[in-house]
Amino acid sequence: MDIQLINIGFGNIVSANRVIAIVSPESAPIKRIISDARERGQLIDATYGRRTRAVIITDSSHVVLSAIQPETVAHRFVVNKEVQANSN
């Protein structure tokens, strides 16, 4: 199993293999997930003080905040997967 890394903005990188969901932070349930993760100490803020535009949820229950759009992060996953497929 190869480790696939995805840039989530400002030089921050997450493991593509660990990501469960990439969602928008606008809804109340997602805001609750962010709040709960902050209380548990499992919130990673990678926004550099900018507005949160994407919330990345991992299989270890960590929640990562990113300042780039969810569509952009998803596109990077697709491109990364295509590159991996072509290299094999």
UniProtKB/Swiss-Prot annotation:
Pfam families: RemA-like. It comes from the Bacteria. Belongs to the RemA family. HAMAP family: RemA. This is Putative regulatory protein PCC7424_3427.
